[in-house]
Amino acid sequence: MELQLAIDLLNKEDAAELANKVKDYVDIVEIGTPIIYNEGLPAVKHMADNISNVKVLADMKIMDAADYEVSQAIKFGADVITILGVAEDASIKAAIEEAHKNNKQLLVDMIAVQDLEKRAKELDEMGADYIAVHTGYDLQAEGQSPLESLRTVKSVIKNSKVAVAGGIKPDTIKEIVAESPDLVIVGGGIANADDPVEAAKQCRAAIEGK
């Protein structure tokens, strides 16, 4: 089981500084969509240039022109790139092909997908590296959690890894870990903690069953 830190609300310098503080406890560091909107792909490059021994994910949330956008993210140092599960099949296939051609990985974000079971099966057959169930900020505010979605997707896929995101914190991560996802994505639960290093350490301990 892997742990990913999602960083959404910092500038690229502070993001790299935070990532380096917790890198002993995480496998993947994400440059979140808001940072990419604010600072562009150079934010991904800054992270890639300033951290070692962890993968860098660019949360592009691609919808179209997929092979080009994947190639650009890779050029700027991304190891994992995200595309939306609601994108066209042709876009997702092109994104997977471009990522794999460069020995990189593609994560498909299932945010706003209505028929999770059907879409997860299709994405699994297409060769997505990760399929991520994601309760976004707006639904978290309504009290929703990704647990049920995680169970649904995990029950139908054969080859892809299952990732889970959405309001996960050190004090709630154990119920997520109990469902055995392949990748647990924690954002504010680490980034906004009073002590991010301690929060990351607790999350790592949870996924290692300690």
From Swiss-Prot:
SUPFAM superfamilies: Ribulose-phoshate binding barrel. One of its GO terms (biological process) is formaldehyde assimilation via ribulose monophosphate cycle. It catalyses: D-ribulose 5-phosphate + formaldehyde = D-arabino-hex-3-ulose 6-phosphate. Pathway: One-carbon metabolism; formaldehyde assimilation via RuMP pathway; D-fructose 6-phosphate from D-ribulose 5-phosphate and formaldehyde: step 1/2. Pfam families: OMPdecase. Catalyzes the condensation of ribulose 5-phosphate with formaldehyde to form 3-hexulose 6-phosphate. Belongs to the HPS/KGPDC family. HPS subfamily. This is 3-hexulose-6-phosphate synthase. It comes from Staphylococcus aureus (strain MSSA476). The lineage of its organism: Bacteria, Bacillati, Bacillota, Bacilli, Bacillales.
